[in-house]
């Protein structure tokens, strides 16, 4: 249905978009609600006293991955790490890639930038500065429960791995980004 680089077969486009000739949603489709659904997921966050508490989010995703995304977030929520999430995004229609399919999630983008990895320190493409794996509890690392939970369901992380392998990308890393593609793209 979808290859490692994000090429979607005609059958896959029919399932994802309701049209074998379509390759993304623009957000203006009359039938968008037939394919993009709002789900609720629970996460942990940290209050001003430094205590963790449960948060419930509404997240827009493609109906084809809705149950899987719920299961991923339930896995993250139930993990002993109790990884905190204070910003979360799903479907958006500003590009033609996985977010516009409803098949990508961004987590804590302030701490987990989209970076140019050829500079030292890394230069944020979104934001103004970036440093790898900060001390922030919101920072996603290769060994975090978040990365493991998405990987368990075949989703990839845009942040690469502990050895700086970025799934075929050698100049950027998108630490906030998880996608239906195993490559994280």
Question: What do these predicted ranges mean?
Answer:
Residues 1-13:
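N-terminal secretory targeting signals
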Residues 80-96, 157-168:
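Surface-exposed patches in mature extracellular/periplasmic domains of secreted proteins
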Residues 101-185:
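Catalytic cores and adjacent binding grooves of peptidoglycan-active enzymes
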Residues 33, 98-99:
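A short catalytic or substrate-binding loop motif that flags glycine-/basic-rich loops and adjacent residues
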Residues 51, 55, 95-96, 168-171, ...:
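Short, solvent-exposed polar/charged micro-motifs at secondary-structure junctions
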Residues 12, 16-93:
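Active-site acidic/histidine clusters and adjacent loop/turn architecture
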Residues 2, 70-74, 147:
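Generic detector of well-ordered alpha-helical segments enriched in charged/polar residues
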């Amino acid at each position: 249905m979808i290859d490692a680089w994000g090429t979607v077969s005609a059958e896959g486009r029919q399932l994802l978009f309701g049209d074998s000739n379509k390759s993304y949603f623009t957000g203006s489709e009359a039938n968008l609600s037939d394919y993009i659904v709002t789900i609720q997921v629970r996460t942990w966050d940290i209050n001003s006293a430094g205590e963790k508490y449960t948060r419930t989010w509404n997240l827009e995703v493609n109906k084809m991955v809705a149950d899987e995304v719920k299961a991923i977030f339930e896995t993250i929520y139930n993990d002993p790490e109790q990884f905190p999430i204070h910003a979360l995004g799903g479907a958006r229609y500003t590009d033609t890639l996985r977010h516009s399919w409803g098949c990508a999630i961004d987590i804590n983008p302030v701490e987990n930038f989209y970076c140019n990895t050829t500079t030292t320190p890394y230069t944020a493409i979104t934001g103004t500065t970036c440093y790898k794996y900060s001390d922030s509890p919101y920072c996603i690392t290769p060994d975090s429960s978040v990365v493991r939970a998405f990987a368990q369901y075949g989703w990839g992380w845009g942040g690469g791995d502990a050895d700086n392998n970025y799934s075929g990308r050698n100049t950027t890393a998108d630490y906030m980004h998880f996608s239906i593609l195993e490559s994280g793209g």
